[in-house]
Amino acid sequence: MNKFMLNETSYHGAGAITAVVDEIKARGFAKAFVATDPDLIKFGVAAKVTDLLDAAAIPYAVFSDIKPNPTIENVQNGVAAFKAAEADCIVAIGGGSSMDTAKAIGIIMTNPEFADVRSLEGVAPTKNPCVPIIAVPTTAGTAAEVTINYVITDVEKKRKFVCVDAHDIPVVAVVDPDMMASMPASLTAATGMDALTHAIEGYITKGAWALSDMFHIEAIRIIAASLRGAVANTPEGREGMALGQYVAGMGFSNVGLGVDHSMAHTLSAYYDMPHGKACATLLPAVMAYNAEATGEKYREIARAMGVQGVDSMTQAEYRAAAVEAVRQLAEDVGIVTSLKGVAREEDIHQMSVDAYNDACRPGNPRETSVEDIEALYRSLM
């Protein structure tokens, strides 16, 4: 039996942001807890939402102690702030950092026996839905607005841990490309390649099935057609990426990912490397490694990436073509698929052990060892 979970409601398209107020009123919430990051406040992005709340006379409190790779301390501070605010819903504005922090706060508030967020690692044993979350993404990548996952960094132990919990999915997602227009080109590229990684890993993961495949292959097609334009800040590119990353999230949230994400989590934990950039850096190498365990799926990936003449190619040819198309897209949007100057040789073994133990690794289509992961890291150094 396969299970599929999504938001209760989602809004898409330019101008969708007004739905935040509509949903707060319709659901009878009295006060919002706005979780966002300092840069979104600094550059006026969060104000696009809080101005609407002000105009509608909806009370709210703002919490912005959120790092790009959110930490245990960020979550603890957020829980304390939520209690002080006496709010009854969360409006999460941002990328994966804000969304993940909001999910952790919301879960702990309704499941206080798990006050230590580390106790929620893996498939979390919570019993109660989290505080209702209205998620407003400002990046086109993580799709955290539609997923049942969140990732927190344990700074002391230099590791990220993944929490999987059906109780944390936002009740509402408001996916407005206008909220993403202020992203610089480099962030657009990194988060966009993260979305492509979600789509590709979700398509080939062990848990994939017919419904998830439909979402993932369409997400690959949309992202391949849109990311270059989004990096150039065209409206069509932004709109396409807003949709493509959400469609990818609809899929992978329900079936899992693979070793690319496991290795990326470790890179971020050790070197504070942005998650999207880490995923993108690894993707071509991990795709080449996994090819032998993917049957004919790389034929469809190549086709969705826009490769011509796929039907006449041999298995080796279409697999190579799929990897090359992804590598070329990464290059075109300015992603360097190398770890030179980033990873340190003395860290490789422990990083590989940590990646092997990551919650995403078991879904990888090819059986993977610590030694395999070490070889993948070293191949990029």
Model-identified regions with their sequence ranges:
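C-terminal catalytic subdomain
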Residues: V255-A321, R327
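C-terminal charged capping/lid subdomain of soluble metabolic enzymes
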Residues: Y298, A302, Q308-M381
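An N-terminal, well-structured beta->alpha segment
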Residues: M1-F63
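Carboxylate- and glycine-rich phosphate/diphosphate-binding segment that chelates Mg2+/Mn2+
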Residues: N149-V255
